[in-house]
């Protein structure tokens, strides 16, 4: 019994290779303009025919396997409930359910509930399910089932450029004489290079003179119209993000006076990918303590908080919340600025919508000791949302953050109605008694404190 899945992968690779060869031969003939002699032309035609015949054989084998496979019933456990087809790249989400990566990613861009369990997902985390993948592979081999191979991405074809090749890309991006199309193509190649090769991330910043400023030149000259060439902007911001993941680059990038303002603009103006990668870059740069001060003193902090309050893009909002939490942890000045810039109302907006709940509660809990935040929490009527979350959540961290906010509300709010609301919650649902017996250490302390106060 031949390895059906391996054969399928080989067939797909053969098809791609043959199509590239055919395109090359045809392009050479079309571009030749009749310069070649007749013998060379005939050879080229023969080569094209050979490739076409080979392609026909490969495609017919593929169709036969697909026909054979169609008669075998795939176990429902191996099918994605979203696509109704066999899983190629199975991943586990926060609820413990497994889905095809492509389809669950698309789902989570619009809805943060589990498609099967219907529960709110407190974290957007996709973990490869190696066990189910191995089981599917074995079943396919045993049943001679042709499981589709994952579609190759652009990065699968990238080979590492030498130093002069990277310099050439930068020259094409930064040169005033380059067309937008050429700049875009060069920026895309640089984004792929920096994604795949750590050496390129290191070399670009360390060895190329004024490389960051030159990379940003096409966007800097556009000013407020930074998104007028969206594909170019996306590729440049993506390259920046890739380079920011290299530890030695973080400080250099943050200290360049053009980088953070550009990222702030790109969070407001740009494609979905651009906005998300700009946010991820700021989150990456905030790993360094000195960078937290730089970012906190810039327009980027407000841009992050504005993005949190928009609710348009779940992934970007999630990343912005994570970035703000990182910036405010152990950095009191950023904490104060975030409060004055409206972090509490932005986080509450997410909590009320039950979107990015895990991160929104973490952000609000972080700043909840401040009196202004307590007043905003009271004014926006989020207490009932918090109590509902406490009753329903099975996540200990979410429970801890929610009860911390409630505890701070009770301790600092001047509203007498808070005590009455909490007492009614305890009488009807025993919410705080349950937390006091089965929550985290911090949650237990807060719940016990609330119980003492409402029973006093």
UniProtKB/Swiss-Prot annotation:
It catalyses: S-ubiquitinyl-[E2 ubiquitin-conjugating enzyme]-L-cysteine + [acceptor protein]-L-lysine = [E2 ubiquitin-conjugating enzyme]-L-cysteine + N(6)-ubiquitinyl-[acceptor protein]-L-lysine. It is an enzyme of class 2 (transferase). The keyword Kinase does not apply. SUPFAM superfamilies: ARM repeat, RING/U-box. InterPro entries: ARM-like, ARM-type_fold, RING-Ubox_PUB, Ubox_domain, Znf_RING/FYVE/PHD. One of its GO terms (biological process) is protein ubiquitination. ARM repeats lie at residues 247-287, 289-329. Residues 73-146 form the U-box domain. Its EC number is 2.3.2.27. GO terms for molecular function: ubiquitin protein ligase activity; ubiquitin-protein transferase activity. Functions as an E3 ubiquitin ligase. This is U-box domain-containing protein 48. It comes from Arabidopsis thaliana.
